[in-house]
């Protein structure tokens, strides 16, 4: 495995080719922190607690598990996936990338440190959650802690699930569930409280893979997350952005304008110093508007671009590559990813069910990171332009911060781009010099700029 990967290690090369353009400030109302998120309204959810009731976890065309309910007294269906993360369940459950999925925790005991408050930081971003609400459809655990202890905790996991309308089941064999999902792949499943549905009733299973989930988690209108000492202005395409991605940008000196996933970003790129594409849920091929807009952006602007997770996949589609669905995905806080430019290995946080088919990547891009567990692609970079993306999450939350330096790399690209733009603006030739140089070069009267194509 390592010998094969070593052969793929290219020499590191600096990003260059940054062209110049004039930077202007976009006229947008500055909304305090992520309170500006205008997420689509959800259907009313049942909030009655179902603690202690009988519950059933049914995998379509697979085994049925009997357990005990906690959380909301409601039935749901979705795609069953598992995470091997030991901690960080509040962050995982509020990660929009889990939208439409039933999350199975392999860690035997969940909930022992409770659920924290919705406190916000100095940028008015949520400190302990990655979005304002639970995003997964339901959770499955081996054992749930009914008593909790932590200085930030304000309620139990069961109380939180009930208040958010999320059903949950405990007392089931999560090892058997994960073994099935690893062998058969991620499967449709449902959680039922009380009497179980007919196991053969297809109407009881909803496939979130057939739905544009990004549309359900993306903001409906642009908003701005401000930094009072901002030196840069970044446009972020919201496909289901995590709070810590916003924090990672704002804390590095940027004000961030967040746009809906299908916003024609290429039409406003000249107002920004960089473009960022966020994480998000579901099949990237559902976001054709985003793919088109990104392709137009790269055709018309040399602006620095960075993508994470779904943003990485959308960027790959925009340059002509293809994506594939993984058998059971990668969802953990301890997955090794090899940097092919340096040979260094990073332990990364991951949450995805799709990956970029590296064999379809165009010649002007190269593979950046590779997964040391399964050999799947974990990143790509342009050979000459300041464009790169990662499949894993350098912002973590939860997970290790090994790769957080990638945000520094992106901001260096942004700073260089802005400074080059300033040099261009300060040194543009005057109309007089354009006329003189044109006459000397071709010996004819130059075409007036106002009439030039």
UniProtKB/Swiss-Prot annotation:
Functional summary from the UniProt entry: Small subunit of the arginine-specific carbamoyl phosphate synthase (CPSase). CPSase catalyzes the formation of carbamoyl phosphate from the ammonia moiety of glutamine, carbonate, and phosphate donated by ATP, the first step of the arginine biosynthetic pathway. The small subunit (glutamine amidotransferase) binds and cleaves glutamine to supply the large subunit with the substrate ammonia.
One GO CC term on file: mitochondrial matrix
Other information: In N.crassa, this enzyme is synthesized by two pathway-specific (arginine and pyrimidine) genes under separate control. One is linked to the arginine pathway and is designated CPSase A (arg-2 and arg-3), it is localized to mitochondria and repressed by arginine. A second one, CPSase P, is part of a multifunctional protein (pyr-3) encoding 3 enzymatic activities of the pyrimidine pathway (GATase, CPSase, and ATCase); it is localized to the cytoplasm and feedback inhibited and repressed by pyrimidines.
InterPro entries: CarbamoylP_synth_ssu, CarbamoylP_synth_ssu_N, CarbP_synth_ssu_N_sf, Class_I_gatase-like, CPSase_GATase1, GATASE
Annotated gene: arg-2
Compartment list: Mitochondrion matrix
pH-activity relationship: Optimum pH is 7.8-8.0.
Transit peptide: 1-33
Pathway the protein takes part in: Amino-acid biosynthesis; L-arginine biosynthesis; carbamoyl phosphate from bicarbonate: step 1/1
Reaction catalysed by this enzyme: hydrogencarbonate + L-glutamine + 2 ATP + H2O = carbamoyl phosphate + L-glutamate + 2 ADP + phosphate + 2 H(+)
Oligomeric form and interacting partners: Heterodimer composed of 2 chains; the small (or glutamine) chain promotes the hydrolysis of glutamine to ammonia, which is used by the large (or ammonia) chain to synthesize carbamoyl phosphate.
Gene Ontology terms for molecular function: ATP binding; carbamoyl-phosphate synthase (glutamine-hydrolyzing) activity; glutaminase activity
Database matches in SUPFAM superfamilies: Carbamoyl phosphate synthetase, small subunit N-terminal domain (SSF52021), Class I glutamine amidotransferase-like (SSF52317)
Name assigned to this protein: Carbamoyl phosphate synthase arginine-specific small chain
Active site (record annotation): 309, 393, 395
GO biological process, one term: 'de novo' pyrimidine nucleobase biosynthetic process
């Amino acid at each position: 495995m390592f010998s094969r990967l070593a052969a793929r290690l290219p020499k590191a090369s600096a990003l260059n080719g940054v062209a110049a353009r004039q930077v202007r400030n976009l006229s947008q109302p500055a909304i305090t922190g992520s309170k500006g998120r205008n997420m689509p309204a959800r259907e009313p959810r049942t909030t009655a607690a179902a603690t202690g009731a009988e519950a059933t976890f049914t995998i379509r065309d697979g085994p049925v598990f009997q357990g005990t309910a906690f959380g909301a007294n409601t039935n749901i269906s979705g795609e069953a996936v598992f995470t091997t993360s030991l901690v960080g369940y509040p962050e995982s459950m509020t990660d929009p990338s889990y939208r439409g999925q039933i999350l199975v925790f392999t860690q035997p005991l969940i909930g022992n440190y409770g659920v924290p408050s919705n406190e916000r930081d100095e940028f008015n971003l949520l400190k302990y959650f990655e979005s304002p609400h639970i995003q997964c459809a339901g959770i499955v655990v081996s054992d749930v802690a009914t008593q909790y202890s932590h200085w930030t905790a304000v309620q139990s996991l069961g109380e939180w699930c009930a208040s958010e309308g999320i059903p949950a089941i405990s007392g089931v064999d999560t090892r058997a569930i994960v073994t099935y999902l690893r062998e058969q792949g991620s499967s449709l499943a449902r959680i039922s409280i009380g009497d179980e549905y007919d196991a053969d009733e297809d109407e009881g299973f909803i496939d979130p893979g057939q739905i544009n989930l990004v549309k359900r988690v993306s903001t409906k209108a642009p908003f701005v997350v401000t930094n009072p000492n901002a030196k840069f202005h970044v446009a972020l395409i919201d496909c289901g952005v995590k709070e810590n991605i916003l924090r990672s940008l704002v804390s590095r000196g940027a004000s961030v304008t967040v746009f809906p996933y299908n916003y024609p970003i290429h039409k406003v790129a000249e107002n920004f110093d960089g473009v960022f594409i966020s994480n998000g849920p579901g099949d990237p091929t559902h976001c054709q508007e985003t793919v088109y807009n990104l392709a137009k952006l790269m055709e018309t602007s040399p602006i620095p671009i960075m993508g994470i997770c779904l943003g990485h996949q959308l960027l790959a589609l925009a340059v002509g590559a293809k994506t594939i669905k993984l058998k059971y995905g990668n969802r953990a806080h301890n997955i090794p990813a090899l940097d092919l430019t340096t040979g260094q290995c990073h332990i990364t946080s991951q949450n995805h069910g799709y990956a970029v088919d590296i064999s379809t990547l165009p010649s002007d891009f190269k593979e950046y990171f590779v997964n040391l567990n399964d050999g799947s692609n974990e990143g790509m970079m342009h050979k000459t332009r300041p464009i790169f993306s990662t499949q894993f999450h350098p912002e973590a939350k939860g997970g290790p911060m090994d790769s957080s330096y990638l945000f520094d790399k992106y901001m260096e690209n942004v700073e260089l781009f802005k400074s080059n733009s300033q040099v261009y603006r300060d040194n543009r030739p005057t109309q007089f010099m354009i006329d003189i140089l044109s006459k000397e070069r071709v010996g004819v009267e130059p075409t007036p700029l106002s009439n030039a194509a």
